[in-house]
Every structure is written in structure tokens, then in C-alpha cells.
Amino acid sequence: KELKKYDVHIIGLDLKEDVIRKCNGLAEKYGYEKLHFLSGDIAEYEGVQKVDMVVTLHACDKATDYALAKAVEWDAQVILSVPCCQHELNDQIQNKLLSPVLKYGLLKERMSALLTDGIRAELLESKGYSTQILEFIDMEHTPKNLLIRAVKTGRSRSGEALKEMTDAIHGHLTLEKLLYPDGFDAKEGV
């Protein structure tokens, strides 16, 4: 079957076997021969070399970072990511200037979640993507309603302001380490 008159091949990954069985059953039931679901971790997935679009939906915590890094590795033209459970930065963030606010756990958690997604978007920009952060569904349906939309432009941006900020809050994401294994050079994108 074509999807909106496009000949597409879709691969879905999830760690939950029951979800994979159900999704493959639905794909078969409705005749989508080019839609396959596999049980596996995106960080270890090697089934393809080139991908046009990567979509993530509530990939918990660092799984979003691994998916975004894979998307960059695959030179995906479009990335649509709905992150979830941004705990990594919450455990790291420290800043004397912000300490009066960061002492409140709820505020620290929310600030960390928003900063995490902003940092992810900026890291994608440093790798040649134009990014936007959008609210894709009303808050009454789910509080996890942010979408990072990234479109490949090939024009990398400097990460100097990002590096200055992440150093100031003592927070560095897994995505940064995956995209820049030798260390984030803020001027690399220029």
C-alpha cells in the first residue's frame, strides 16, 4: 500500500514485545506490507543506513537522545520528536544565580525539562538542522505536548552561546556526548 501516494517503508522500534506484536498485527490486518515493527533499542539498531524521516514519541529520558543522534547519523532530512521524562539534566543542573529557585523540586524539574528540549534543538542546529519547538496538542490531553521539529538545511550554527549556558548550569546531555564524542567544540558549526 502507498501512503498518501508515496512509496514508503516504515520501521517502528520499541522495547515492549507486546506492543510490537500488536502493531505488526494491525499492519498485517490493514495490508501495510511495508510497515514493520521490531523489538529493539534505537541505540543499537543497525538495520538501515539512510533514513528520510525519524519520528520519536515519548522515548523516555536518554532514549530520545539516542534516537536524535541516530537521526543525525542517518542524515535524516526531517526529525519529529516528542520527548518524555527529561531526568538527566535535572540530576546535573547547578547554578548559584538560580539556586533560590532550583531548591524547589517541582520548579527544578520543569525548568530542566524545558532546558533539555531547548538544548536538544540547539545541538541539532549545530549539526545543520533548522529547528522549532512547538506545542502539538492541547495541554488538556497530555502535559507532554512539545514537539521538536528539525529540517536538514546543511547550514550548521555555532554553539558558542549553548556551550556557555551548559557550562554555566553544569549540565551536559547524552545527545551532546553522542554527537560530539571528542567534546563539544562550540565553533564547529561555524
Predicted regions and their residues:
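Conserved SAM-binding loop of SAM-dependent methyltransferases across substrates and taxa
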Residues: 1-5
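Conserved beta-strand positions in the Rossmann-like core of class I SAM-dependent methyltransferases
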Residues: 9-11
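Class I S-adenosyl-L-methionine
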Residues: 13-190
